[in-house]
UniProtKB/Swiss-Prot annotation:
InterPro entries: Ribosomal_bS18, Ribosomal_bS18_sf. GO terms for biological process: translation. This is Small ribosomal subunit protein bS18. Binds as a heterodimer with protein bS6 to the central domain of the 16S rRNA, where it helps stabilize the platform of the 30S subunit. Residues 1-25 are annotated as: Disordered. One of its GO terms (molecular function) is small ribosomal subunit rRNA binding. Belongs to the bacterial ribosomal protein bS18 family. HAMAP family: Ribosomal_bS18. Keywords: Ribonucleoprotein, Ribosomal protein, RNA-binding, rRNA-binding. Part of the 30S ribosomal subunit. Forms a tight heterodimer with protein bS6.
Length: 99
């Protein structure tokens, strides 16, 4: 009877620390570091009139793609954001996705 009064997760049913060590040995995949496209091509000026290039950095919903996804460095991301905003203001790029 004393065994039936125990809680369902009693110490005898818990996994030991050795199980965690085995489970923690997952295969680690090599993630290639993203390099800034503008730094590689040595582009200093991001032109707001180059819609084809800017469109690659705008998601299908109309949002600007973040740095961690696009791989652009911080200075170029700031210039890219300014160029996309200028292109939106003169109606070269949409503010939102068309439904």
């Amino acid at each position: 009877m004393a065994e039936s009064k125990g809680r369902p997760g009693s110490a005898s049913q818990r996994p030991t620390g050795g199980d965690k060590a085995i489970a923690g040995q997952k295969k680690q995949y090599f993630r290639r570091k993203k390099v800034c496209r503008f730094c590689v091509e040595k582009i200093d000026d991001i032109n707001y009139k180059d819609v084809k290039m800017l469109h690659a950095f705008v998601a299908e919903r109309g949002k600007i793609v973040p740095r961690r996804i696009s791989g652009v460095c911080a200075p170029h991301q700031r210039r890219l954001t300014d160029a996309i905003k200028k292109a939106r203001n003169i109606a070269l790029l949409p503010f939102a996705a068309s439904f």
